[in-house]
Amino acid sequence: MDQGGRGVGAEHGKYRGVRRRPWGKYAAEIRDSRKHGERVWLGTFDTAEEAARAYDQAAYSMRGQAAILNFPHEYNMGSGVSSSTAMAGSSSASASASSSSRQVFEFEYLDDSVLEELLEEGEKPNKGKKK
């Protein structure tokens, strides 16, 4: 596999973690160092930029500030902000660039009690209001 195009740059926009399929779509994948370099499939995308952003999101969630990204300016790595704040900024940029019709929500995992509280809050409007 040719890794000469590290990051943005080489001929006609090669991105890290992105391959062009013969039929014109772009495939994104990343290697998981926690699983001995096992490939993790990220999906097939209409544009190389969408695939590169999917790679960046996976790389940042796996490696944090140590990740080598295609679009590092979309992640506030140098400042002291939390990863959820940095991801919120990149998610909006990624969502606006995506031509996909599906809606994706991402939550930073804190602990089970926070998840349970969020789920309970979501069920409250369905139970009716008591005065």
Curated annotation (Swiss-Prot):
Q: Where is this region: Disordered?
A: 80-103
What GO terms describe the biological role, i.e. biological process, of this protein? ethylene-activated signaling pathway; positive regulation of abscisic acid-activated signaling pathway; positive regulation of cellular defense response; positive regulation of DNA-templated transcription; stomatal closure
Q: CDD domains of this UniProt entry?
A: AP2
Tell me, in one coarse class, where this protein mainly resides.
nucleus
Q: Which GO terms describe its cellular component?
A: nucleus
Give the location in the cell.
Nucleus
- DNA binding happens at which residues? 14-72
SUPFAM superfamilies, sorted: DNA-binding domain
UniProtKB keywords = Activator, DNA-binding, Ethylene signaling pathway, Nucleus, Transcription, Transcription regulation
Family per UniProt?
A: Belongs to the AP2/ERF transcription factor family. ERF subfamily.
Q: What does this protein do?
A: Probably acts as a transcriptional activator. Binds to the GCC-box pathogenesis-related promoter element. May be involved in the regulation of gene expression by stress factors and by components of stress signal transduction pathways.
Against PANTHER family, the record matches this protein to:
DNA-BINDING DOMAIN, ETHYLENE-RESPONSIVE TRANSCRIPTION FACTOR ERF096
In Swiss-Prot or TrEMBL terms, this protein is called Ethylene-responsive transcription factor ERF096
- Source species of the chain: Arabidopsis thaliana
User: The organism's lineage?
Assistant: Eukaryota, Viridiplantae, Streptophyta, Embryophyta, Tracheophyta
The gene is ERF096
